[in-house]
Design a protein with these regions (language model features):
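Glycine-rich phosphate-binding loop and adjacent beta-alpha segment
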Residues: 95, 224-291, 325-328
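Short amphipathic alpha-helix with an adjacent loop that forms part of the alpha/beta core around
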Residues: 204-212
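C-terminal capping/lid region of NAD(P)-dependent oxidoreductase domains
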Residues: 2, 291-295, 306-328
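Short glycine-centered segments of the SAM/dcSAM-binding site in methyltransferase folds
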Residues: 87, 153, 177, 237-238, ...
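Mid-domain Rossmann-like dinucleotide-binding core that forms the NAD(H)/NADP(H) cofactor-binding site
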Residues: 130-204
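Glycine-rich beta-strand-centered segment in the early N-terminal region that forms part
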Residues: 22-40, 52-94, 220
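NAD(P)H dinucleotide-binding glycine-rich loop of Rossmann-like/cofactor-binding domains
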Residues: 57, 91-158
Length: 328
């Protein structure tokens, strides 16, 4: 038996209950991982609330969580790439999420396909990489699209959240000038400390502020400001849509396309093991150089999963939210 956070129906955070569940039999291509940290993501919030229904005929009981960092404690008979004691990170690929092909990461132990894991070297702080985690992989995809480097100025919306704060840190690690947009004035100083060269406060319900001209936009918000983000792009600029916390229905002037701008998007649903290992390798390389630091993280015990979901919903913190199974 192992402890896990279980959801038995859609609704408020209080429906997340800590229960004892059976350990599944390990398949030949799987490893059993003792979870050190499980990231809490907006995806988990939307699924629990019923906004993003689980894509199974009988979705409950359901264990949330789309990313984990932990240590291998058992290996299947066919696994040749990992050993007991190895530190690994895994995310998406049917773990939790709407696909729910296997139980999610909100538990003490999780069974994962070895091919879905990225091995972590001994010099990497496991809690730092857990904090960067899926947010860092997502932000990296955004910069791959819009471009990074000393000749780039990139605007990041939703900069105070999990992915946004990682995008600010990652952009600076890649040598990019960063404009951070947040709706919460209380987060401005923290964003500057993360490396933002300029912070724009755009409170909800108020007229959008004047945005500076940028070469790229990493958009995590969507909604009413989207058209203004497009206008902020210099000729030939690029916008990457990574999430729509303010809604995915947007409008913009089509004439902007005549200035050579391009728009695209990325979803972590496209991740596979090879892509994960490549992204994690790039992120940990920056960590070793000392150029990429983990953003702040609020940490909760498994039993406090409801409080962790409330923390994400309230959006009062900056950075990420983690569940730590070993915290009593």
């Amino acid at each position: 038996m192992r402890r896990a956070v279980v959801l038995n129906g859609y609704g408020p955070p209080e429906l997340l209950r800590l229960e004892k569940v059976r350990r599944p039999t390990l398949r030949a291509d799987e490893v059993r991982v003792r979870v050190l940290a499980a990231g809490v993501n907006r995806t988990d919030i939307e699924i629990r609330a019923g906004n993003w229904p689980i894509q199974k005929p009988q979705p409950f009981p359901y264990i949330p969580g789309v990313e984990v960092v932990g240590r291998v404690i058992e290996i299947g008979g066919g696994v040749k790439t990992l050993r007991q004691g190895d530190a690994v990170i895994s995310m998406m690929m049917g773990m939790g999420g709407v696909r729910a092909e296997r139980p999610g990461g909100y538990q003490e132990e999780v069974a994962l396909r070895a091919a879905d894991c990225a091995l972590l070297s001994v010099d990497i702080d496991l809690f730092d990489i857990a904090t960067i985690g899926l947010a860092g992989v997502t932000a990296l995809a955004g910069f791959d699209f819009v471009g990074a480097g000393p000749d780039r100025r990139v605007l990041v919306t939703g900069a105070g959240g999990g992915v946004g704060s990682c995008a600010v840190s990652l952009g600076k690690a890649l040598g990019t000038s960063i404009v951070a947009v947040t709706r919460d004035r209380r987060k401005a100083d923290a964003l500057a400390r993360l490396g933002a060269d300029e912070v724009v406060v755009a409170p909800p319900g108020e007229a959008p502020p004047q945005l500076p001209v940028v070469t790229g936009v990493v958009d995590l918000v969507g909604g009413a400001m989207f058209g203004q983000l497009v206008k902020a792009l210099s000729p030939g600029g690029k916008l990457c849509f990574l999430g729509g916390t303010a809604g995915d229905a947007v409008s913009f002037s089509a004439s902007s396309l005549m200035e050579g701008i391009s728009m695209g998007g990325w979803s972590s649903e496209v991740l596979d093991g090879a892509a994960l290992r490549s992204a994690v390798g790039r992120l940990t390389s920056l960590m070793r150089r000392g150029t990429l630091s983990a953003p702040p993280a609020a940490k909760f015990a498994l039993a406090d999963a409801p409080a962790a979901h409330h923390a994400v919903q309230r959006d009062e913190h900056i950075g990420r939210v983690l569940l730590l199974p070993d915290v009593p």
